[in-house]
Amino acid sequence: MDQSRRRWLQRSGALCATGLLGSWPHLASAGTRAKAGAFGPLEAPDAHGVQLPAGFNARLLASSGQFVRGTDFRWHAAPDGGATFATPDRGWVYVSNAEVPDHQGGVGALRFDSRGEIVAAYSILTGTTRNCAGGPTPWGTWLSCEEVANGMVYECDPLRSGQGIVRPLLGTYWHEAAAVDPKTGFIYLTEDDQEGRLYRFRPQFYGQLDTGILEAALVGLDRTISWVPVPTDAPYRGDDSTAFARGEGAWIAADNLYFATTADHRVWAYSIRTSHLEVIYDAIALGEDAILYEPDNLTMHAQTGALLVAEDAGDLQLILLAPRAGRWEAVPLVRFEGHGGSEVTGPAFSPDGTRLYVSSQRGRDGEHGMTFEITGPFLGLTRKS
């Protein structure tokens, strides 16, 4: 990232720092920059502009508007949030949202056999608007979220072609991501708006989203969160809740909810057990040492506990955040060179943790998205340099 843009981002982040969360203490846990990547520096870009460390390789799987190889299915425009799901035949499915306006969005799916080869491609949702991120559920469905003022969440079956079911009780607002607590079935939802809220849906019955209560987070002075019941028919902006500066990706692991806010360049961790909230990465606090700006989609490598965070813009990187010695270390894992009009979207690992799926939303020409599979020694993600 050039220095003028970095300074502009720092100023814009400071302008966002105007409320309770803006004045959040710059804690020691707000991240640190690694001297070198866990696998060494990124190498020269490949033919598609993908930069990876030594030992990693990228394969282009699908391009917007083109038939997925071996199928009669055209890949959608603007691929965004994604996830993988295991299949009974030891394969898996990768789903990808289409962030397209005017009811032209939806969700596409790539099905792989046990060897990692594509055997089918199909749609699991159509006719929706700006499907941004979302999240997988423990019961095997995909929650696809619309990022518009009247946005809704749709629950989709990833394993077969079909149409999702709208879930209005999850709220009507600028939806971004959804993360489900596997223990309780509670769903945590982010909102991509400058005055967005962090929401929680408490279903009456585990895995059933047609009854339950929607709540918004209120952050106390002691950095603990309490939850306030809110209506479901419009974005909530009550004074009894806390604004987050454009909520983005979300993921739950080991009783912690991790989520990003792109306007103030932060990644957060909320302890579901203790209700405590903390900042684990803060680009503004790090200043010139920061390498991750405008954090967006995120996912976790289940086998190692490493957190991967995609940049909305910035240097078009996928950044590894890994806990070491009580701090979160940030290192680049993927960078897209020559994709200046794009953003990094949809990171998700195969169920066995050996393959990473990720997209350049608008590709090298600024119009046609590119979805990749990256292979390499991912099981060493937490290894020190």
Question: Model-flagged regions — what are they?
Answer:
Residues 8-385:
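Sequence/structural signature of beta-propeller domains
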Residues 1-7:
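N-terminal secretory signal peptides
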